[in-house]
Every structure is written in structure tokens, then in C-alpha cells.
Amino acid sequence: MASLRQIAFYGKGGIGKSTTSQNTLAALAQMGQRILIVGCDPKADSTRLILHAKAQDTILSLAADAGSVEDLELEDVMKIGYQNIRCVESGGPEPGVGCAGRGVITSINFLEEEGAYDDTDYVSYDVLGDVVCGGFAMPIRENKAQEIYIVMSGEMMAMYAANNISKGILKYANSGGVRLGGLICNERKTDKELELATALAAKLNSKLIHFVPRDNIVQHAELRRMTVLEYAPDSKQAGEYRTLANKIHENAGNGTIPTPITMDELEDLLMQHGLMPVVDESMVGKSAEVAA
């Protein structure tokens, strides 16, 4: 059996991380790869398009009902979806109570003990990335995920989150084998978005793996709780996800140790590639009317 690839998709909330990851993994499955998805986002939406479900029961909620995680069996928590993709959601506590990362730690340990990673080509962790706290950094910290793919856009907060995630990778890169596989730009139609994403990737000592164009067919598929690969397999957008999947498949061993940048450097990038072609500190804090 080929060696197991453990990858993770990180990105700020609302960036389209779960949608991008599920479509990409569906494409990998179509290529004959055996996939296990481990959802590490408290929203528990990392598998809905694969399972055609609103939200999968999480390991933490099932453990609470059963008494403890030791009372669960693998078949209790794992569901099989499109292209035989196996799906698990770690879950998290009620809002305002406890650490959301606890579910990630509990779930990964349980899955390993139960042999969930056997006969698998890819394990994919779908992780919230606004805050790289200890729990959410678990796949990185414990040397589980070897390749991190950051879903971002040309918007400032998405880039800020990508830089923060890179800091988390850097912290554990030397003690473990984790590497930044690359950035995936989920287009938001901001000015000079492709150039900006490419420039940020270069600053982070990485590369832009793929620029995913915006297409309403993604939302049409989501309303039916389906990936584009299943909903419209011959569409141009399905082809984009297949291209992305191929690039990730060919990217084994090509990850890098990232070089995060400062906030000033990030703002400079935005000014160079965004709405303001010239960096002019005198314009900071002035309205559009005054600036004109």
C-alpha cells in the first residue's frame, strides 16, 4: 500500500474551506484514492456535501450519549458517503463552555486506536483557522497532519488568518514533519486577487497551489447538499476541483517551512496589489471623499 498522506485544510471561518476541501476530496476519490475526512470544525459541516446531510453526529455528542468515548465503536461514528469516502466529525462543546479543541484531540486518538486509518490513502483534517489555539493546532502539534493547505482569498482577514496559520506551522515544523503544502485561493472577486494571492504565497516561502474561480454552481450544489463533482460532473467548476486535486496529489514531499510576515508587510502587500497602487501613509484614516 502507498504511504498514507495526512493533509489538513485550514482557513478562516466562512472562507469556503469545507466546501473547497469536500469538492477536492471528492475529485481525489474519483481518481481512485481512499479517503477519510476528519472534521475538526465545531460547525460539524466538514462532511455534509459528501453525506448529503445537514450535519453529522459528532464523536463528542455520541460519547456524551453513550457515557464515554470508550463506549463507542468505530461504526457508531463513521459514515460512508459519495465515492465511498469515510466521514467523521469530532465536534465541540456547547458555545461558551469548555475547549473546542478537546474534541479534536479525543477524536484523533479514538480513530487511531480503532484502526480507522487502515487501508486509507488520504486522511484529511478540516480545521477552523481564525484562531490557532492548542486544540485546533492538534493535527499540526502532534505531527498528525504532514501537509497543510490554507484556503484564503484576497480579503485582508483571510490573508491575516493564512499568515497566522503559517506561524503555527513554523512553530512545530522543526520538531515534527509538518510542512505548508501551499495556498488555495477561493476567489472573492477582489481587485488583483490572483496577483495578491501569488505574492502572499511567495512571501510565505510557499506557492499558490490553485486559484479556484467563483461560480454560482457551487452554491446550487450546496443547496442540494452535494459536491459539484456529483451535482454537475461535466461542469467547468468540477474541472477546476479536479485540477486542484491533481496538483495536491502531485505535491507529495514538496511542502515548505513557512516564513510568516509582519502586519506591516501584509498591509504593504495589500496596498501594492489592491485598491491603492501607491503606498501613501498620508491617506490612512481618510474617507474616499477626502482622499479624492
UniProtKB/Swiss-Prot annotation:
One of its GO terms (biological process) is nitrogen fixation. The reversible ADP-ribosylation of Arg-102 inactivates the nitrogenase reductase and regulates nitrogenase activity. Binds 1 [4Fe-4S] cluster per dimer. This is Nitrogenase iron protein. Its EC number is 1.18.6.1. Keywords: 4Fe-4S, ADP-ribosylation, ATP-binding, Iron, Iron-sulfur, Metal-binding, Nitrogen fixation, Nucleotide-binding, Oxidoreductase. The keyword Cytoplasm does not apply. The key enzymatic reactions in nitrogen fixation are catalyzed by the nitrogenase complex, which has 2 components: the iron protein and the molybdenum-iron protein. It is an enzyme of class 1 (oxidoreductase). InterPro entries: NifH/chlL_CS, NifH/frxC, Nitrogenase_Fe_NifH, P-loop_NTPase. Its cofactor is [4Fe-4S] cluster. It comes from Herbaspirillum seropedicae. [4Fe-4S] cluster binds at residues 99, 133. It comes from the Bacteria. The keyword Acyltransferase does not apply. ATP binds at residues 11-18. The modification ADP-ribosylarginine is found at residue 102. Homodimer. Belongs to the NifH/BchL/ChlL family. It catalyses: N2 + 8 reduced [2Fe-2S]-[ferredoxin] + 16 ATP + 16 H2O = H2 + 8 oxidized [2Fe-2S]-[ferredoxin] + 2 NH4(+) + 16 ADP + 16 phosphate + 6 H(+). GO terms for molecular function: 4 iron, 4 sulfur cluster binding; ATP binding; metal ion binding; nitrogenase activity.
